[in-house]
């Protein structure tokens, strides 16, 4: 947990009092497209503003972004493409999203580094955990692109693994719904929001929040996950401040 007396980054003020000192924020790529293929600059700018507010509060923020606004390997496989090749295409999509978010964060005055699991030295650093931690300690945002660098692994699993390796306090899983429900709220009007639940229960009940590999990894290593609605402005700050939003998943 964060020291409540911690000074905001670069002398900038913030009304947030972070409950977590280091967080891993998982963003779905579909949100970056505003429901379309490609990037919606207005959406990326809005997310960057929210992250900047959190960084100014003194919290350390790392980010993993999906690539679903460009490619989804599993869906391309269903159309006849080789799964491994389509997954690599999806990884490149995550890098495009990462560079876009980096650009908008820099415009907010937040120093940002992109680290990729696939080497592409002209646009990003290679993924080096100790270097990532050092960037975070200096108040920089670190965005992890290209997933795990391996096919068959989702960006949800990447988020869980990166959170564990950099010593994050929590995975903040941003979604287009308010949290974990007993059923899909877009299909079942009687679905109820769960305020708290265990990793095991999510897996056993087959609740579609993230893939089972990500939840198993977090469960085995005691990593909490907060599932919340990114579409509500200011929710990233509320999540970092420890406010009662979304669903907290613990062991």
Swiss-Prot record:
Protein residues bound to UMP: 67, 87, 148-155
GO molecular function (one): UMP kinase activity
Highest taxon, organism lineage: Bacteria
Binding of ATP, residues: 26-29, 68, 72, 181, 184
Pfam short name (any one): AA_kinase
Main subcellular location: cytoplasm
Catalytic activities: UMP + ATP = UDP + ADP
This protein's pathway: Pyrimidine metabolism; CTP biosynthesis via de novo pathway; UDP from UMP (UMPK route): step 1/1
Primary enzyme class: transferase
Keyword terms, alphabetized: ATP-binding, Cytoplasm, Kinase, Nucleotide-binding, Pyrimidine biosynthesis, Transferase
Coiled-coil portions: none
A GO biological process held by the record: 'de novo' CTP biosynthetic process
GO CC annotations on file: cytoplasm
EC nos: 2.7.4.22
Activity regulation details: Inhibited by UTP.
Compartment(s) of residence: Cytoplasm
Subunit structure: Homohexamer.
General function of this protein: Catalyzes the reversible phosphorylation of UMP to UDP.
Family: Belongs to the UMP kinase family.
Protein's name according to its UniProt entry: Uridylate kinase
Species of the source: Mycolicibacterium vanbaalenii (strain DSM 7251 / JCM 13017 / BCRC 16820 / KCTC 9966 / NRRL B-24157 / PYR-1) (Mycobacterium vanbaalenii)
Source species taxonomy: Bacteria, Bacillati, Actinomycetota, Actinomycetes, Mycobacteriales
């Amino acid at each position: 947990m964060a020291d409540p007396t911690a000074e905001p980054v670069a002398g900038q003020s913030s009304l947030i009092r972070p409950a977590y000192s280091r967080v891993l924020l998982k963003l779905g790529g579909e949100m970056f497209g505003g429901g379309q293929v490609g990037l919606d600059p207005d959406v990326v700018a809005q997310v960057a503003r929210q992250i900047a507010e959190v960084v100014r509060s003194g919290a350390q923020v790392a980010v993993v972004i999906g690539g679903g606004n460009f490619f989804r390997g599993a869906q391309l496989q269903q159309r006849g493409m080789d799964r491994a090749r389509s997954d690599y295409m999806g990884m490149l999509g995550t890098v495009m999203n990462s560079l876009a978010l980096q650009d908008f964060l820099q415009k907010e005055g937040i120093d940002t580094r992109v680290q990729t699991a696939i080497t592409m030295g002209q646009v990003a650093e290679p993924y080096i955990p100790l270097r990532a931690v050092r960037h975070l300690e200096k108040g920089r945002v670190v965005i992890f692109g290209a997933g795990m660098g391996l096919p068959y692994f989702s960006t949800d699993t990447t988020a869980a693994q990166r959170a564990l390796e950099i010593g994050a306090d929590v995975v903040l899983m941003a979604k287009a719904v308010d949290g974990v429900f007993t059923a899909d709220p877009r299909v079942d009007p009687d679905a109820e929001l769960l305020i708290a639940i265990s990793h095991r229960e999510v897996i056993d009940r087959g609740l579609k929040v993230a893939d089972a590999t990500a939840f198993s990894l977090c469960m085995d290593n005691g990593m909490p996950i907060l599932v919340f609605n990114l579409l509500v402005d200011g929710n990233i700050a509320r999540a970092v401040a420890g406010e009662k939003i979304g669903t907290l998943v613990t062991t």
